[in-house]
């Protein structure tokens, strides 16, 4: 017969707590929706600014306004997502996607508004029927038909600003 070994008084691991666990901090879905609505508003304001000033703009001014719009869109979206979504990485990533799309659609909507103002509603209807992706093609290329590298740079700036600011603000907040 083997000798008996003494029993341990407690298990070697801590037992899980009883009761409900506290909810995770932040509201990632609400943060994404709030960022989306803010991005739509910033993009509409940018489109209105371009519509009001397109006759007096040089290429340098247009590119500067586009990059400024992308940074502003990313900063506002990132700030809101960081405040509401806290440390949720998925909310930060979706904020970057939303900010980049806001920069793209702000530019393409401005092109359509300028076309409607300068040539009338019939031109927009023809555009929709025969060349629906023309605003995106105009966003991607410059006047000579070459790739306009300010366009993807604006997307990168918007996404980086949104993710970076959301990450900084979200990680600064304390978890309960």
Model-found features: residue ranges?
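C-terminal binding/interaction regions
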Residues: 108-176
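Intrinsically disordered, low-complexity Pro/Gly-rich regions
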Residues: 1-21
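Cytoplasmic membrane-interface segments at the C-terminal ends of transmembrane helices
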Residues: 22-23, 27, 49, 76-96, ...
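Loop-to-transmembrane alpha-helix initiation sites
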Residues: 68, 72, 91-95, 147-157
């Amino acid at each position: 017969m083997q000798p008996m070994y003494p029993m341990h008084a407690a298990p070697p691991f801590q037992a899980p707590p009883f009761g409900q666990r506290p909810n995770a901090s932040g509201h990632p879905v609400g943060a994404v929706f709030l960022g989306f609505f803010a991005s739509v508003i910033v993009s509409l304001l940018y489109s209105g600014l371009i519509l009001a000033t397109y006759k007096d703009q040089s290429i340098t001014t247009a590119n500067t306004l586009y990059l400024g719009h992308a940074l502003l869109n990313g900063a506002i979206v990132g700030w809101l997502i960081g405040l509401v979504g806290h440390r949720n990485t998925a909310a930060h990533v979706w904020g970057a996607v939303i900010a980049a799309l806001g920069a793209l659609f702000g530019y393409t909507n401005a092109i359509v508004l300028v076309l409607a103002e300068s040539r009338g509603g019939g031109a927009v209807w023809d555009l929709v029927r025969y060349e629906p992706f023309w605003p995106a093609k105009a966003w991607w290329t410059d006047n000579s038909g070459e790739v306009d590298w300010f366009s993807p740079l604006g997307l990168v700036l918007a996404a980086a600003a949104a993710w970076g600011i959301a990450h900084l603000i979200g990680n600064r907040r304390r978890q309960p």
